[in-house]
Structures are given as structure tokens and as C-alpha cells.
Amino acid sequence: MDGIKYFVVTDKSIRLLLKNQYTSNVESGSTRTEIKHWVELFFGVKVIAMNSHRLPGKGRRMGPIMGHTMHYRRMIITLQPGYYIPPLIKKST
């Protein structure tokens, strides 16, 4: 799972969970076929479709020099009916 950074929890991503769609941020250089292969191999699910878009990096200033944070890519992964990805929440004891 080198390409997938983390799953995103926003209002939209929670709404998409009802449609069996999962949202995650991935590395910019990863391709759709790589991400699809990793998701199917790691979670044992079947992927129907994948949508992606690039999110812009935020501007950061250090004195007179203006820089920016890294750009990253967000993938919306649609699974076949009957498949799901278990929650990745660590239980506190």
C-alpha cells in the first residue's frame, strides 16, 4: 500500500459511503491501474470505477520566500455491490 496515503473523512466522503464509494488521498505519481491493483489485492474487493482529481498545494511563506506544500491526488473508488472496506479506526483501550 505504498501509493495510498490515507482515507479522507469529510461530509462528502461520508455521503459517498452510502453509495459504496470510498475516498482516499494517494501519491501524485501513482496511476489508476496501480491504485486499483493495490486496493483489490490488499482489501480483497472488486473495483468498478475510479475517479480522481488533483488538489492544489497551499502557499507557505518563510520570510521573503514564498513556497507551497506538495500537491496530491484524491481518488474516489467505487466498489461492486456486496463488497466493502472495513473501517480503519484504531480502537482505544
Curated annotation (Swiss-Prot):
It is found in: Plastid, Chloroplast. Pfam families: Ribosomal_L23. Signal peptide: none annotated. GO terms for molecular function: mRNA binding; rRNA binding; structural constituent of ribosome. Keywords: Chloroplast, Plastid, Ribonucleoprotein, Ribosomal protein, RNA-binding, rRNA-binding. It comes from the Eukaryota. GO terms for biological process: translation. SUPFAM superfamilies: Ribosomal proteins S24e, L23 and L15e. GO terms for cellular component: chloroplast; ribonucleoprotein complex; ribosome. PROSITE patterns: RIBOSOMAL_L23 (PS00050). Its main location: plastid. Part of the 50S ribosomal subunit. Binds to 23S rRNA. Belongs to the universal ribosomal protein uL23 family. This is Large ribosomal subunit protein uL23cz/uL23cy. It comes from Morus indica. The lineage of its organism: Eukaryota, Viridiplantae, Streptophyta, Embryophyta, Tracheophyta.
